[in-house]
């Protein structure tokens, strides 16, 4: 495990917002929390080459999921977003589901080992019915 944390995520996000070649970024199990996900989300709004972002086993929670969902509204490059085991509940999934309605580029969203519950599953189901 690499301890990157929110400060490390900030530095990576600054570079990512300017990078034009990287397609995959694996940041699983690096101690990123909601603040770090905000930095990464802001970078995703500017980046148009990253296709895979792996944030499994971090601590972004519902707020972090909302930040990333907001970025998905603008980002048209990301194809795979790994968010397994991040403490995301139905509240966070609500924002991700709404982003899926608008974003037609993302085709893999991993929410394994989160407690999305029935509400989260319903939000995702509704979004998938309306995603074209």
Predicted regions span which residues?
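Leucine-rich repeat
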Residues: 6-15, 34-42, 62-71, 90-98, ...
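Inter-repeat linker/turn residues at the boundaries of leucine-rich repeats
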Residues: 17-20, 45-48, 73-76, 101-104, ...
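Conserved hydrophobic beta-strand positions in leucine-rich repeat
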Residues: 23-27, 53-55, 81-83, 107-111
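Intrinsically disordered, low-complexity polyampholyte segments enriched for Lys and acidic residues
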Residues: 34-35, 42-48, 56-59, 63, ...
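Leucine-rich solenoid repeat scaffolds
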Residues: 81, 109, 125, 129-131
